[in-house]
Amino acid sequence: MRSNPTTSGSEVSAVEKKNLGRIVKIIGPVLDVAFPPGKMPNIYNALVVQGRDNEQTNVTCEVQQLLGNNRVRAVAMSDTDGLMRGMAVINTGAPISVPVGGSTLGRIFNVLGQPVDNLGPVDTNTTSPIHRSAPAFIQLDTKLSIFETGIKVVDLLAPYRRGGKIGLFGGAGVGKTVLIMELINNIAKAHGGVSVFGGVGERTREGNDLYMEMKESGVINEENIAESKVALVYGQMNEPPGARMRVGLTALTMAEYFRDVNEQDVLLFIDNIFRFVQAGSEVSALLGRMPSAVGYQPTLSTEMGTLQERITSTKEGSITSIQAVYVPADDLTDPAPATTFAHLDATTVLSRGLAAKGIYPAVDPLDSTSTMLQPRIVGEEHYETAQRVKQTLQRYKELQDIIAILGLDELSEEDRLTVARARKIERFLSQPFFVAEVFTGSPGKYVGLAETIRGFQLILSGELDVLPEQAFYLVGNIDEATAKAMNLKT
């Protein structure tokens, strides 16, 4: 083993006594570290590189492999620029631990739990390791219940499961960020819960934009940071694969504390779950593992399962997770999205066509799905209403080509009625959001599930056929639509 030229022999023996190792090899973000016999760190232990003259660098690594001959292979959580062979490495004796609790709300963290928002240190002594086992089966809450969001289109057609996992599909500029912020706002108001946002391998600009929009809409309260409703954790795409692979676990660890200790309902956002898989693939290649299908890591299912199994409801509280899913080349059979789908309870698909019409939230009512939409779970009334809404919209979709070519007048009386009701339904699925008040000037609306079902039943029954369709656009419950129609007449 080659020693650092600045370190004398007496210092080396002192280093060995202190249970330190030395870097023997550096390949990009991967370090090989040699330790004295009997002083080997465990898998997932955090190692901190010590600079020259015992100055601590900011490079933390995580042990991934035990190579034999008293050597370990570790993956760096930040850039390895400036590191050299022979540098001392401290074995912390524990996995990476991050701050947890109420003082994390309103703050932005990196993968190591260090605040990166220039607001000073986090006021807490409570930390938690990012590697934990999933809750035991006996701790789980197996009762199937709907997680009411107050958003009509979601609650009626693709309801979320409390403690479930939801995939959010949508391109740029269709309202994904606003939908996420509205959900954060509504869980705080209706459920007394909090949210954790994990930015996994996305653009730094997007993270900055989200933070600014959250401050503007009041989700993050700058005056009184403790009243904020969300903690943000970022591992952006310019960071090494180790950071992008572990940042999801950092966010999840913060969410678990709110669930298990504070006994709250928590919303965990992961944007983007595909980047988590991609980072794992990069790390796997760096560690020399043989790639599996389409070049992905052979441990893909295990890594995904380790993360997803910790996201669940327990008897204390729940973590409901909303995960943005990027589908490479729109290929749903790609191993990354295909592995993700196996864990999802619902999908919320955002449509560019609806956004172009000005219907927000631009949730596609026909493409969005949920395993919760069954009569034995949601009840016959909810199920029947949702199915009739979908049938009406599907028939309208089928008739659109005929309308475009021949016009409405060529349709039968029954089809014309279906089209009129479908257009009212389409507009009634829109809704003013609390977080968009600052942009639109319209006050936000939270619509309970019972009110949502009643409103769509009235449209389907034909009782509101005489009202103009613009009365249903961007309103809360059905009573507001009838009041708006009266105003339009006067």
UniProtKB/Swiss-Prot annotation:
Keyword Transmembrane helix: no
Listed SUPFAM superfamilies: C-terminal domain of alpha and beta subunits of F1 ATP synthase, N-terminal domain of alpha and beta subunits of F1 ATP synthase, P-loop containing nucleoside triphosphate hydrolases
Localization in the cell: Plastid, Chloroplast thylakoid membrane
Main location: plastid
Cited PANTHER family: ATP SYNTHASE, ATP SYNTHASE SUBUNIT BETA, MITOCHONDRIAL
Reported function: Produces ATP from ADP in the presence of a proton gradient across the membrane. The catalytic sites are hosted primarily by the beta subunits.
The name this protein goes by in its record: ATP synthase subunit beta, chloroplastic
Originating gene: atpB
